[in-house]
Amino acid sequence: MEKVPITIRGFAALEQELKHRQQVERPRIIQAIAEARALGDLSENAEYHAAKEAQSLNEGRVLELESLISRAEVIDVAKLSGSKVKFGATVQLIDEDTEEEKTYQIVGEPEADVRSGRVSITSPVARALIGKGVGDTVEVSTPGGGKSYEIVGISFSG
């Protein structure tokens, strides 16, 4: 079973989502199925079919979350240090074309969210940054073409 690296914050979010799906969503969906069944003929009962589909999606996500949680390798980023980019690092970059500053934290796949500045360790950006230090320039291949960034800061905080 392949371990999945994840931060403490990311692991807590997975546990919270699992708890919500099991304790809130599951009972709500079961109630919706019961109410739809009470309406009669199930073959043409849109409410019943919608509730069953919601149940299927919810249970699928529950299984996925349980698998991720069982395979998680929780890493306390606050205990990490160093001068090179690695899992958990928060990296400040300057786009060499636009001079725009960007900040990314390198996290596990389940917790990645580019809009929040968290990129997956398997992403092109993270792969280009791993092992590099402040002052290094990295080339990143993106769907819109190549980008050059200079690393101007590396920090580790939870």
From Swiss-Prot:
PROSITE patterns: GREAB_1 (PS00829), GREAB_2 (PS00830). Pfam families: GreA_GreB, GreA_GreB_N. InterPro entries: GreA/GreB_C_sf (IPR036953), TF_GreA/GreB_CS (IPR018151), Tscrpt_elong_fac_GreA (IPR006359), Tscrpt_elong_fac_GreA/B (IPR028624), Tscrpt_elong_fac_GreA/B_C (IPR001437), Tscrpt_elong_fac_GreA/B_fam (IPR023459), Tscrpt_elong_fac_GreA/B_N (IPR022691), Tscrpt_elong_fac_GreA/B_N_sf (IPR036805). GO terms for molecular function: DNA binding; RNA polymerase binding. Keywords: DNA-binding, Transcription, Transcription regulation. SUPFAM superfamilies: FKBP-like, GreA transcript cleavage protein, N-terminal domain. GO terms for biological process: DNA-templated transcription elongation; regulation of DNA-templated transcription elongation. Belongs to the GreA/GreB family. NCBIfam families: greA (TIGR01462), PRK00226.1-2 (NF001261), PRK00226.1-4 (NF001263), PRK00226.1-5 (NF001264). Necessary for efficient RNA polymerase transcription elongation past template-encoded arresting sites. The arresting sites in DNA have the property of trapping a certain fraction of elongating RNA polymerases that pass through, resulting in locked ternary complexes. Cleavage of the nascent transcript by cleavage factors such as GreA or GreB allows the resumption of elongation from the new 3'terminus. GreA releases sequences of 2 to 3 nucleotides. This is Transcription elongation factor GreA.
